[in-house]
């Protein structure tokens, strides 16, 4: 058993001295005698000294305490016993429901599947949210980013996606809360409980109040649990299709920045860690589908100061299949979900994948919205009366499209009092195609606001004129 002693403690950083001929590997977990604290080796400084990051508070630690090398990385429980439970970064239960019964324990540092093991599918994943299904469709086994500044609805959108997909998909989900509000974690737990889908969700939380080491590693803990479900073959000889929700990827980067500064690395652009791209790659490359099973990941990405060129969101962009950009200006109009249809994109936007009708409808909707955007300056200066009849018609349709993108959410029922709506993809395409074809030019634009399918628009318009 390899033992060393603590020689220095600076906040979350602990230096431990081991015999020179038996230094622990980087990422090995160290246990400290008499405490529940786990240290993770980050650097080997020479002379037998390793620099570690503490996963937990270092209060009460002192020099010369004995640290034991476990000989492996941090391990967490995996298997069906994790479903319906809330765990911390080390896999300890934090929901006061007794110990977790686990099938196995896996290390959180793992290699991504090899290139020949990976599989890509082009099957669409219906979300029931009109603007997403039409403008930036999701792929099963793909990666989706929800980009947005503070308070534009990333978490609410993610909750609705979980509500819609987890129920319809009826597969397994893993939720990793990375550096977010504890209140949101609590709300999420009760939301899942009330929806009766708790037995299909494993939750891993490392919230805002926890040390940077916990927040940096909690995403890997959640991912490891998801990988087990994907890779472990059931009676049919196949793994499972898993949904992995990460809220919030930016906090993962931020925790890496804090750890990097504590380790004394020279910061790069805007104060981020020099290893930003590598750290992001380590996480994202493991989120993939194999011939055995798939991981579909939906990640909330906080955009600092609404600047999409900030290194953190910019690095995340390259790993994603679909990007859903939430806009403050659209939220200011009272249109929720505040998705910017011209700024959101998807690799699935191909007629061979989504079909001719869907593709053509989306293109026409984009053209109409772009035309309205181009005319906004003229309208602001000269007013609507100076526009040609064609332009007036385009503006009228664009405003109807904008309002038809709004939709009442199931998870927001408690706040709005309006029952949530799930709109199938076929209904969505039919509704928007009819608007751009001019079938509803005679209806007032208010009738298109906060409804489900196009039939509800007609019903609302009839009530308004009655």
Swiss-Prot record:
Produces ATP from ADP in the presence of a proton gradient across the membrane. The catalytic sites are hosted primarily by the beta subunits. Pfam families: ATP-synt_ab (PF00006), ATP-synt_ab_N (PF02874), ATP-synt_VA_C (PF22919). ATP binds at residues 148-155. Keywords: ATP synthesis, ATP-binding, Cell inner membrane, Cell membrane, CF(1), Hydrogen ion transport, Ion transport, Membrane, Nucleotide-binding, Translocase, Transport. GO terms for molecular function: ATP binding; ATP hydrolysis activity; proton-transporting ATP synthase activity, rotational mechanism. This is ATP synthase subunit beta. InterPro entries: AAA+_ATPase (IPR003593), ATP-synt_VA_C (IPR055190), ATP_synth_F1_bsu (IPR005722), ATPase_a/bsu_AS (IPR020003), ATPase_alpha/beta_chains (IPR050053), ATPase_F1/V1/A1_a/bsu_N (IPR004100), ATPase_F1/V1/A1_a/bsu_N_sf (IPR036121), ATPase_F1/V1/A1_a/bsu_nucl-bd (IPR000194). CDD domains: ATP-synt_F1_beta_C (cd18110), ATP-synt_F1_beta_N (cd18115), F1-ATPase_beta_CD (cd01133). GO terms for cellular component: plasma membrane; proton-transporting ATP synthase complex. It is a peripheral membrane protein. The gene is atpD. It is an enzyme of class 7 (translocase). F-type ATPases have 2 components, CF(1) - the catalytic core - and CF(0) - the membrane proton channel. CF(1) has five subunits: alpha(3), beta(3), gamma(1), delta(1), epsilon(1). CF(0) has three main subunits: a(1), b(2) and c(9-12). The alpha and beta chains form an alternating ring which encloses part of the gamma chain. CF(1) is attached to CF(0) by a central stalk formed by the gamma and epsilon chains, while a peripheral stalk is formed by the delta and b chains. Gene3D superfamilies: 2.40.10.170, Bovine Mitochondrial F1-atpase, Atp Synthase Beta Chain, Chain D, domain 3 (1.10.1140.10), P-loop containing nucleotide triphosphate hydrolases (3.40.50.300). It catalyses: ATP + H2O + 4 H(+)(in) = ADP + phosphate + 5 H(+)(out). Belongs to the ATPase alpha/beta chains family. NCBIfam families: atpD (TIGR01039). Its EC number is 7.1.2.2. It is found in: Cell inner membrane.
